[in-house]
């Protein structure tokens, strides 16, 4: 067992060095879904000398990954020093992340750290700016439990059936967490 901040080594048999790169995530098969869109809560540093504007190009860092992205501000025109906001990051490459993962963003040029935050939704749909329902959904995802997130995903699928395995992949939760939350939601009558 290892913890954040520790260095570890893993022996991966039958894997060639060119098949993996810095930032790859080691996870059980079909437990995560690669994404190039992220819904996040972004906090700009008090010490930042710059203001984040819509469609700013940024360097995104999480774990050992570094990816270029565009920041679409969902609830504000700009985010200044010491402020925070809901942002959809549109990545230039796909990565695998989980809800709750922390990240850091830096300006594209000059490469100065602007802030960081937490991933609220690892597999969102493209969102439009200044939509009340979008902001409400992100507020629920920020303050809610994993059961709330599952309920939102089930609602988004409407009349179609979605399996627990697919919910686990979409939410990047473990199958056990999903099964427990689905049982709780069924008992409440939230989902059927």
Where are these regions (language model features)?
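C-terminal effector modules of nucleic-acid-centric enzymes and ribosome-associated factors
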Residues: 2, 14-192
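NTP-handling and nucleic-acid-processing catalytic cores
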Residues: 11
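Membrane-interface junctions of multi-pass transporters
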Residues: 4-8
């Amino acid at each position: 067992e290892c913890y954040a901040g520790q260095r570890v080594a893993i022996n991966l048999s039958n894997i060639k060095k060119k098949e993996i790169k810095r930032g790859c995530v080691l996870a059980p098969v079909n437990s995560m879904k690669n994404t190039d869109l992220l819904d996040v809560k972004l906090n700009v540093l008090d010490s930042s000398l710059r203001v984040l504007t819509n469609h700013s190009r940024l360097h995104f860092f999480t774990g050992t990954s570094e990816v270029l992205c565009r920041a679409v501000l969902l609830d504000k025109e700009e985010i200044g020093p010491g402020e925070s906001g809901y942002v959809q990051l549109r990545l230039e490459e796909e990565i695998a992340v989980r809800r709750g993962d922390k990240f850091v963003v830096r300006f594209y040029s000059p490469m100065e750290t602007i802030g960081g935050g937490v991933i609220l939704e690892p597999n969102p749909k493209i969102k439009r700016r200044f939509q009340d329902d979008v902001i409400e959904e992100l507020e629920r995802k920020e303050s809610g439990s994993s059961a709330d997130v599952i309920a939102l995903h089930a609602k988004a699928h409407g009349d179609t059936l979605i399996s627990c395995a697919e919910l686990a992949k979409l939410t990047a939760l473990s199958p056990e967490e999903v099964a427990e939350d689905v049982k709780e939601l069924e008992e409440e009558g939230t989902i059927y």
